[in-house]
Amino acid sequence: MSLFNTVRNTIVPVHKEGYPFVAAFFVASLVLGWIFKPLFWIGMIFTLWCAYFFRDPERVTPQDDDLVISPADGKVSAIQMVTPPAELDLGSEPMLRISVFMNVFNCHVNRAPMRGRIVSINYRSGSFVNAELDKASEDNERNGLVIETRHGQIGVVQIAGLVARRILCWANTNEPLDAGERFGLIRFGSRLDVFLPAGAAPRVSLGQTAIAGETVIAEFASAKGPVISRHS
């Protein structure tokens, strides 16, 4: 496992969800290399790509409870006022939705956009159309979190994509989250939607590249309530 440790510790950390995949590709490379030596190097290319896909770099998150931080690496694909998904129970009034689309080359670890406490987690099965399409918000498999923040409740929805077939969320209801804290992962291409209440103004533009845990995607004008911390 020396190669695995090198990739994890020297190049960039690999998320634990990727360990089985990296190990499987590495073993397959050894087997193929035993059959035909050049196949080992081809297999190693795929092994390194898999480690790259599951990379989990450290991020420096702005410490300001009025800021909304990107929950995912990728491209800002939508900024619009829409009615939030019914399963989030956020009401029927339009909310600001900012969507970040992740392709297969982006880091797929998802991070909390704001500090708060998880009110609910709602999973919905669905199809697997291209996550960049607008209808993916309603048709695709998804997992939605509602987070209570000092500016009210916000929604964060993990949406599976054309290639993605597994949404992972290790957060639990009633748990606190810090801005930039890891809470989930989606394998192989997907999208994150953030739903924000009145008072939030976008700070990104369509097509802009966002970095999870670092890029400010929206901002609230002023504080509305007490800071929600792990000790609240």
UniProtKB/Swiss-Prot annotation:
Q: Where is this site: Cleavage (non-hydrolytic)?
A: 189-190
Give GO cellular component annotations, separated by semicolons: plasma membrane
- Recite the UniProt cofactor note for this protein: Binds 1 pyruvoyl group covalently per subunit.
Tell me which residues bear Pyruvic acid (Ser).
190
Q: Which UniProt keywords apply?
A: Cell membrane, Decarboxylase, Lipid biosynthesis, Lipid metabolism, Lyase, Membrane, Phospholipid biosynthesis, Phospholipid metabolism, Pyruvate, Zymogen
Q: Where is the active site?
A: 190 (schiff-base intermediate with substrate)
A single GO BP: phosphatidylethanolamine biosynthetic process
Keyword 4Fe-4S annotated = no
Q: What class of enzyme is it?
A: lyase
Q: Which cofactor does it need?
A: pyruvate
On the tree of life, the source organism's domain of life is Bacteria
Q: What post-translational modification does the entry describe?
A: Is synthesized initially as an inactive proenzyme. Formation of the active enzyme involves a self-maturation process in which the active site pyruvoyl group is generated from an internal serine residue via an autocatalytic post-translational modification. Two non-identical subunits are generated from the proenzyme in this reaction, and the pyruvate is formed at the N-terminus of the alpha chain, which is derived from the carboxyl end of the proenzyme.
Please list the reactions this protein catalyses: a 1,2-diacyl-sn-glycero-3-phospho-L-serine + H(+) = a 1,2-diacyl-sn-glycero-3-phosphoethanolamine + CO2
Q: GO molecular function, one example?
A: phosphatidylserine decarboxylase activity
Enzyme Commission code: 4.1.1.65
Lyase in keyword set? yes
Subunit info here reads: Heterodimer of a large membrane-associated beta subunit and a small pyruvoyl-containing alpha subunit.
Q: What does this protein do?
A: Catalyzes the formation of phosphatidylethanolamine (PtdEtn) from phosphatidylserine (PtdSer).
NCBIfam families, from UniProt? PRK05305.1-1, PRK05305.1-2, PRK05305.1-3, PRK05305.2-5
Record HAMAP family: PS_decarb_PSD_A
Concerning its family, UniProt says: Belongs to the phosphatidylserine decarboxylase family. PSD-A subfamily.
Protein name as annotated? Phosphatidylserine decarboxylase proenzyme
Q: Its encoding gene is what?
A: psd
